[in-house]
Structures are given as C-alpha cells and as structure tokens.
From Swiss-Prot:
Written domain comment of the UniProt record: Possesses an unusual extended V-shaped dimeric structure with each monomer consisting of three distinct domains arranged along a curved 'spinal' alpha-helix. The N-terminal catalytic domain specifically recognizes the glutamate moiety of the substrate. The second domain is the NADPH-binding domain, and the third C-terminal domain is responsible for dimerization.
Family statement: Belongs to the glutamyl-tRNA reductase family.
Organism annotation: Mycolicibacterium smegmatis (strain ATCC 700084 / mc(2)155)
UniProt-annotated binding residues for substrate: T49, C50, N51, R52, S109, E114, Q115, Q116, Q120
Role noted for this protein: Catalyzes the NADPH-dependent reduction of glutamyl-tRNA(Glu) to glutamate 1-semialdehyde (GSA).
Catalytic residues, chain numbering: C50 (nucleophile)
Name recorded for this polypeptide: Glutamyl-tRNA reductase
Length: 451
C-alpha cells in the first residue's frame, strides 16, 4: 500500500475551479466517508485551504484508488471527471511525500514561505485523526510533515519578508493608493485567523481606523478591541451593515470562507454613492482573499475600484519570488524526504527480520525439547548452560545479516531484500503480517509538539 495524492491548487487551476471544489469540515468528512467506502482505500485525509484542495489516501492499487478519489471529488464539485482532471495533479508514493513536505514548509504556497498552511495541515490531520480515518501510514506522514514544516520555518529565513497573502495584497494596495496606507481607513471582513492577520499587517502599515465586519458581532468586537489596544481606532460591524462600513474605507480585505460573496455590487455601489454625496475621494482597493470569492466579480467594473484577488496575487512578481533562504528550505525538505523514506523502507523489512528471529527461537526451543527427551537425566545447571550457548550461537549467526539487511532495505529498491529473506528461510507470509500488525504504534494526536 502506498500514499496517493489527488489535488487541485492555485498552480493548476483558476480561482473559479477552486471555488467549485472548496469545502468546509462537514463536506470534507463526507468526501472521506465516500472515498473510504471503496475497499481500495484504507486511509484518507482532506486538506482544503483558499489555495488548494488535496486528498491524501492510502490505496491498495494506484489506478483503482485514483479513479475512486477523482470520481468522488467530481461529484462533490458538480464537474465532470474529464473536466476536473484537466486541472488536477497526482502524486504517488515518494512524490506524494515530497509534495506534502513542501506544502507544510510553505514552498508550494501562492506566496512562498507563508506560515498559515502549516496550521491548516495540522487542522486537516487533527480532523481526520478525530474521525479515525487515518492509520499508521498517514499518521506518520502527517506528523513528519508538520515537523519538517516547523524545522524549515525555524532554521531558514523563508518567511522573513512576511510573505503571506495578506502582506502581498496590502503591498499591492499601497502602490495603488497615493501616499500609502498611513492615516487611512480599512474594512476587514471576517474576524477569523485571516482577519486577525490582516489587522496585524494594517497596524504595522500605520492604518488609522479599522471597521471589523463579521457575521458574529461578538467575534468582531473581540478583534476590534485587540486592534484598539494597539492604538488603532476600531469598531465592530455586523455583516448586515457591511455597506455602511465601506463608505469611508480606502482598503477592504475580505476572507470569510462563506459559500457566496459577502461583498456585493450593491454594497460597494452604495458606498461610492455616499462618497459622491459627501464630495469624498472615490478610490477604493478591495482585496478578495476568500475561497470561494468573497467579492462579487462585478465590483471590479466600478469606477475608482481596484480589486486584488488570488489570481492577481499569483501574477505579482513579489509573490512569485522565493524568499532569501528558499533554496535552503528546499534542501531541508529533500533531506527530510530521503530520511523519511529510508525509515519507512526499514520499517517494512523489520517484521520479516522479527519473524526470522522468532523462527530461529522456535527451532532452538524445539531442539532443547528434543535434548530433554534424549537426555532426561541432564541436570538443570548443565541444561541451562547448553540452552544459553545455543541461543548465543543463533544470535551471533543472525546478528550481522539482519543488521545488514535493514541497512540495505533502507535504500531505494530495498524491499527485494525482505523478499529474499522470506524465500531463503521459507517464512510464512501470514506470520510476517501478524508480526507487522502487532508492531503498529498506538495512534496518538501529538499536535503540540509541532506547533
């Protein structure tokens, strides 16, 4: 069994396609349930962010597993399988491992080095673990990926430039607004993690006033209070009053995770009309960071309004440029992938080695029993010495070849050595499988260590 990845991301598809595939946790659970109904899939996890939807699964067969996952995603998105595959990418076995490590490290993000994806992978794994849809393989893969991501961010400067989607969007807004963001007013739509991140960037940019708009007013009030404590004039606005919050906003940042746009054409049109009546400036930059889109596409056609969406961010040179230490990050990922795969190959041969040692122990015990029957008068002391000697001989004979076979098995193609052991010593495949099952680790959520 190997890991299969079926995914669609900002690198392979336009925002409109990602919108069709965008899912919440409840929908992700349904996708996993459908995928696991097939006997070809034994474990599954869904990673859904504003920039990607990826299904990681442990499959019995590549083509069969690929067909199952592709069909489920096509049905959930309302697309035909043929249309979906035009935008999809597939990674299998080693390539799937390398991809997830790169994702958690921020190397596959719209803006190289952004850290939010590490938390998103953590939540995806936690959800799958809570729903018991991951077993040994995905458990070990996810835990190692989180560890690799943390190492990359702590040992390199890949995120030194604050390379998040928010910072790039605001950088683009500053170039559009004469005089930058200092002393201006912003509207932050959505008071979740992205909203809080947007607020932090706005404070650093010298923004003077922030309207925090959210469906849950108490949540908006909490973020507004936090911004006020940082020296910004901030207030909370319910989503129903969003048009009012846009009237004096020079820049709008929206990322809510809503199914439909929350910033409508009517809302922005109303805000512009109020500005006209007041004789105020019409210029407004709207940063749509939502997935699906938070902003009605028609808004971009209004005079004086410039919309920054995910497609535009991806085309921004600063978003495509690697951080200073990106190469170092890639080297870490490559080394971690090699170490992980070597460990996995070694783990695969371990049950065979254990079964061989058990087979040898059984032979020793059988011969000692035969000795007891042939020499019933042998005293206990001599019998124990003979037993120890025989066991030492067997251990010494097996030590070098078993250690060596583990070393050889860790290299690519090393599974042939385990097969050779099974053939040479006529080891029962069922006995080997029984040993492997007994050696499965207790699956525990170890999220704190990767934060």
């Amino acid at each position: 069994m190997s890991v299969l990845l079926f995914g669609v991301s900002h690198r392979s598809a336009p925002v409109s396609v990602l919108e069709q595939l965008s899912t919440n946790e409840a929908e992700q659970a349904k996708i996993i349930d459908q995928v696991l109904q097939s006997s070809l899939v034994t474990e599954a996890m869904v990673l859904s962010t504003c920039n990607r939807v990826e299904v990681y699964a442990v499959v019995e067969a590549f083509h069969g597993g690929l067909s199952v996952i592709g069909q489920v995603l096509a049905e959930r998105s309302g697309m035909s399988l043929n249309d979906l595959t035009k935008y999809a990418y597939v990674r299998y076995a080693e390539a799937a491992v390398e991809h997830l490590f790169a994702v958690t490290s921020g190397l596959d993000s719209a803006v190289i080095g952004e850290q939010q994806v590490l938390g998103q992978v953590r939540r995806a794994y936690a959800t799958a673990e809570a729903n018991r849809t991951v077993g040994r393989t995905l458990h070990e893969l996810a835990q190692r990926a989180l560890s690799v991501g943390k190492r990359v961010h702590s040992e390199t400067g890949i995120d030194a430039a604050g390379a998040s989607v928010v910072s790039v969007a605001l950088g683009m807004a500053e170039t559009k607004l004469s005089g930058g963001l200092g002393g201006r007013t912003a509207a932050v739509v959505g008071a979740g993690a992205m909203g809080a991140l947007a607020g932090a960037h706005l404070v650093r940019a010298g923004i003077e006033r922030v309207h925090v708009v959210n469906r849950s007013l108490p949540r908006a009030e909490r973020l507004a209070k936090n911004l006020t404590e940082q020296g910004v004039v901030a207030d909370a606005v319910g989503l129903d009053d969003i048009a009012r919050a846009l009237v004096d906003a020079d820049v709008v940042l929206s990322s809510t995770g809503a199914v439909r746009p929350v910033v409508s054409l009517a809302d922005v049109h109303y805000a512009l009309a109020q500005r006209t009546l007041a004789g105020a400036e019409h210029q407004m930059v709207v940063c749509d960071l939502g997935m699906p889109r938070d902003v009605d596409p028609a808004v971009s056609g209004l005079p004086g309004v410039w919309v920054v969406d995910m497609d535009r961010i991806q085309r921004e040179p600063s978003a495509r440029a690697a951080a200073v230490d990106a190469e170092a990050a890639r080297n870490i990922v490559a080394a971690e992938v090699a170490n992980y795969l070597a460990g996995q190959r070694m783990a695969e041969v371990t049950p065979t080695v254990t079964a061989l040692r058990q087979r040898a122990a059984d032979v020793v015990e059988a011969e000692l029993l035969r000795l007891d029957n042939r020499l019933p008068g042998l005293d206990a002391a001599h019998r124990d010495e003979v037993a120890k000697t025989v066991r030492r001989v067997v251990d010494k004979l097996l030590h070098a070849p078993t250690v060596r076979v583990k070393q050889l098995a860790s290299a690519p193609g090393g599974d042939s050595y385990a097969e050779a052991l099974r053939e040479l010593f006529e080891l029962d495949p069922q006995a080997v499988e029984a040993v492997a099952a007994s050696e499965l680790p207790l699956i525990t959520t170890d999220l704190d260590k990767t934060e």
